[in-house]
Regions:
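Hydrophobic core residues within well-ordered beta-strands of beta-rich domains
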Residues: 34-36, 121, 135
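Compact, glycine-rich, soluble single-domain proteins
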Residues: 64-74, 79-88, 103
């Protein structure tokens, strides 16, 4: 059984763009193939709500190899798109002590229906825990009125230190 809706997807006005791709780039560091958001269409600072969408294209890098006869948006990219949505919210509202929000983990994630080229994936997130060390967002994804994905995204603040090389873990 699907979870209770964070927000009814039919109530989200997709024509009311709060941030287009260029505005998203000013906040989120992902580029090229890993830019997973097309637009942000809702931000509510009082309820810690955000909604945005990804227009799934037929020429994306994964289409050729992820089930060539029946291309499906990989679940990991759905999760990445949701994480980018949450990161945009945290950074643009100034709730983060860092340069960007890094992927901290996933909990309770379920995929309920496929997402295919030509679909518009609407993502809705609600911040349920936000502090200096960690954020947790409940997220849901829809194609039309169909819930295709839900789960919890954990984020951690990261600082870019351009003069230090990456360290092995």
């Amino acid at each position: 059984m699907p979870p209770t809706l964070i927000v009814d997807p039919a109530s989200v006005d997709l024509s009311q763009v709060v941030a287009d791709r260029e505005a998203i780039r000013r906040v989120n560091p992902q580029r090229y193939e890993l830019e997973q958001l097309t637009a942000i269409v809702l931000m509510d600072g009082e309820q810690h709500l955000i909604a945005g969408y990804k227009d799934v294209g037929a020429e994306e890098f994964w289409v050729r190899g992820h089930l060539p006869d029946y291309p499906l948006l990989p679940g990991v990219l759905i999760c990445e798109a949701a994480a980018q949505l949450c990161s945009y919210y945290i950074v643009s509202t100034g709730l983060l002590q860092g340069d960007f929000l890094g992927f901290g983990g996933l909990e309770n994630v379920r995929f309920r229906s496929p997402v295919r080229p030509g679909d518009r994936l609407l993502l809705i997130g609600k911040g349920t825990r936000m502090n200096r060390r960690q954020t947790i967002f409940n997220v849901q994804g829809f194609v039309g009125a169909t819930m295709v994905f839900h789960g919890d995204i954990l984020g951690v603040p990261l600082h870019r230190q351009e003069d230090e090389p990456a360290q092995e873990v």
